[in-house]
Amino acid sequence: KAEQKITSGTYELNTDMDYNALVNSMSSRSGSRMTVSITIPEGYTVDQIFALLDEKGVSTVETLQNVAANHDFKFSFLKGVLPLGDYHRLEGYLFPDTYEFYMGGGESAAIQVLNKMILRFDQQFPDALREQAANMGYSVHDIVTIASLIEKETDGSDQTSIASVIYNRLNNPNYETVGYLQIDAALVYATGRVITQADYQTVDSPYNTYLYKGLPPGPI
C-alpha cells in the first residue's frame, strides 16, 4: 500500500515502471511532473492569461478564476484593491514574462502559478518607485491602473502625450473635462466589445470614465 501523497498533475512516466516506482514518481517530492514554458505577452488581461494557461495545460480557467477571486495573496499592494470574490482583482498584477510552470494540478497548484506571477510583479516594482508614487499622492494600485490606461489607449507611439493628458485630468479638477478621464479603452474593457459614442452616456459602469470621474476601480 502506498503511503506517499500523490500530487495531482501531468507526469512523464516510463512504461517499465512497477507499481512502487509509479507511486514514487507521482509523489509530491518527485521531479518527474511535466513542465511547460509559457510567455505571457504584455497587455494581456486576466481573462486572456487564464485562457492561455488553460490552453497550455497548466490549470483550468475555472480553477484560476476561483483562486484569483478567493485566495488572499499576501502582498501589501493588493490591500485595498477590488474585494475578494472578484477574480479581476488581480488585473494588472500578473506580470508579463516567460515562466516555467508545472502542468495540471488543482487549487494549490493554481495558487503557486498566480503567486509566481504576482511575485514577479513585486520584484519589478521596487521601493523607490513606490515611494515616488506615494510622494505624488498615488498608491501602487493607482499607478498600475494609470499605466494600463496608457498602454491600452495607445498603439505605443504616443504614450507620453496620453500620460500627460491623464495626469492633467486627474490633478486639475478644473481642467476642460472637469475630472472625467474620457478613456475609450476603459469602456471597451467594461463592455468587451467595440464601443460607439452612444455608449459614453448609456453604459453605467465605473469603468466608463465619461460618466464617472477619476480612475476606474482597477487596471484594464
Where are these regions (language model features)?
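Bacterial extracytoplasmic/cell-wall-associated proteins, especially those involved in peptidoglycan
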Residues: 57-59, 73-220
